């Protein structure tokens, strides 16, 4: 069997996994899983110690999306009963930021449905972010869809720290998930974000009938894109979406996926994102031996577990919350 600790040491010296080594992680026998996670934790602990970054989503605009993404309950092809509303106002976004501050959330994520933001929607986000930075000093991540260079520049100027735009899957599998935009459209937005000086956040959704080679390709593509933060979502197959009833993930495989992303992107923030609770289930704590970041609270159209359960999990693991806000005028 592979010596996972030895491989971890090689990775930290700059070694990049070959495809066969990456696939071996996904094919790791269950009786070696803890050894695999030991290697992943060796990497994680060198770069992040025992700290965990907390993130919280504000669903700033829900539904009403013209795209045809097969996984999404907000898409034009979904029949799932989701709330639909236009962009929230500044005051509502500020109330969400205040809650995030009270919960020791390091990154407040403003997420809006749709192909891409209108200039008016960017205006609202810009206005809110300026005040969020002044009052709470939180890091802010925006996720508004495909982005124009001038919009990216405005977000950067307002104080947005990070922009999320997931590649979601591999380039070869992308047409099986959506045809209303291309994989290259997504990559172009990540590049636009980087050019504007924003920290790029880009991740994946696992469980959409992709192959193991697809997953390896995703991890490698994100390394090549140099994404600072990589959210790993596990499909929560919602009734009324084209992918409903297709999820065949199990908790052990999800842990192997998280380990793969750590071995292939050793220095990056790896976040256990959507679908954590329903796919990792009782093995959620083990995921943090590979990942160093989670979402707290609810997702866009699905519920997370009770916030208190997340904080108790971190306490039981002996991990510390990374929280260092820098408000400019103090919390009021």
Swiss-Prot record:
Pathway: Cofactor biosynthesis; biotin biosynthesis; biotin from 7,8-diaminononanoate: step 2/2. Binds 1 [4Fe-4S] cluster. The cluster is coordinated with 3 cysteines and an exchangeable S-adenosyl-L-methionine. Binds 1 [2Fe-2S] cluster. The cluster is coordinated with 3 cysteines and 1 arginine. GO terms for molecular function: 2 iron, 2 sulfur cluster binding; 4 iron, 4 sulfur cluster binding; biotin synthase activity; iron ion binding. One of its GO terms (biological process) is biotin biosynthetic process. The keyword Iron applies. [4Fe-4S] cluster binds at residues 65, 69, 72. It is an enzyme of class 2 (transferase). InterPro entries: Aldolase_TIM, BATS_dom, Biotin_synth/BioAB, Biotin_synthase, Elp3/MiaA/NifB-like_rSAM, rSAM. Its EC number is 2.8.1.6. It catalyses: (4R,5S)-dethiobiotin + (sulfur carrier)-SH + 2 reduced [2Fe-2S]-[ferredoxin] + 2 S-adenosyl-L-methionine = (sulfur carrier)-H + biotin + 2 5'-deoxyadenosine + 2 L-methionine + 2 oxidized [2Fe-2S]-[ferredoxin]. Residues 47-273 form the Radical SAM core domain. Its cofactor is [4Fe-4S] cluster; [2Fe-2S] cluster. Keywords: 2Fe-2S, 4Fe-4S, Biotin biosynthesis, Iron, Iron-sulfur, Metal-binding, S-adenosyl-L-methionine, Transferase. [2Fe-2S] cluster binds at residues 109, 141, 201, 271. Belongs to the radical SAM superfamily. Biotin synthase family. HAMAP family: BioB. Catalyzes the conversion of dethiobiotin (DTB) to biotin by the insertion of a sulfur atom into dethiobiotin via a radical-based mechanism. Homodimer. This is Biotin synthase. It comes from Geobacillus thermodenitrificans (strain NG80-2). The gene is bioB.
């Amino acid at each position: 069997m592979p010596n996972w600790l030895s491989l971890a040491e090689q990775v930290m010296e700059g070694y990049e996994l070959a495809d066969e080594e990456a696939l071996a992680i996904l094919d790791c026998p269950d009786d070696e899983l803890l050894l695999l996670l030991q290697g992943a934790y060796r990497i994680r602990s060198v770069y992040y110690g025992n700290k965990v970054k907390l993130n919280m989503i504000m669903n700033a605009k829900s539904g009403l999306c013209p795209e045809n993404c097969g996984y999404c309950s907000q898409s034009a092809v979904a029949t799932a009963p989701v709330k639909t509303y236009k962009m929230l106002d500044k005051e509502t976004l500020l109330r969400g930021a205040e809650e995030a501050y009270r919960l020791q959330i390091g990154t407040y994520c403003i997420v809006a449905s749709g192909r891409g933001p209108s200039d008016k929607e960017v205006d609202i986000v810009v206005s809110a972010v300026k005040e969020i930075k002044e009052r709470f000093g939180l890091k802010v991540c925006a996720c508004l869809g495909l982005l124009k260079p001038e919009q990216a520049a405005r977000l950067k100027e307002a104080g947005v720290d990070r922009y999320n735009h997931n590649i979601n899957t591999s380039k070869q599998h992308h047409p099986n998930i959506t045809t209303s935009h291309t994989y290259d459209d997504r990559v172009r937005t990540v590049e636009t974000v980087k050019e504007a000086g924003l920290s790029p956040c880009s991740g994946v959704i696992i469980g959409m009938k992709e192959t193991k080679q697809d997953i390896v390709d995703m991890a490698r593509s994100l390394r090549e894109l140099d994404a600072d933060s990589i959210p790993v979502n596990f499909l929560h197959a919602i009734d009324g979406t084209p992918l409903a009833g297709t999820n065949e993930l199990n908790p052990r495989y999800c842990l192997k996926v998280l380990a793969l992303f750590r071995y292939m992107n050793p220095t990056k923030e790896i976040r256990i994102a959507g679908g954590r609770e329903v796919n990792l289930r009782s093995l959620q704590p083990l995921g943090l031996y590979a990942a160093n970041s989670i979402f707290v609270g609810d997702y866009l159209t699905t519920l997370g577990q009770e916030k208190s359960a997340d904080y108790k999990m971190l306490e039981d693991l002996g991990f510390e919350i990374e929280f260092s806000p820098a408000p400019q005028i103090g919390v009021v």
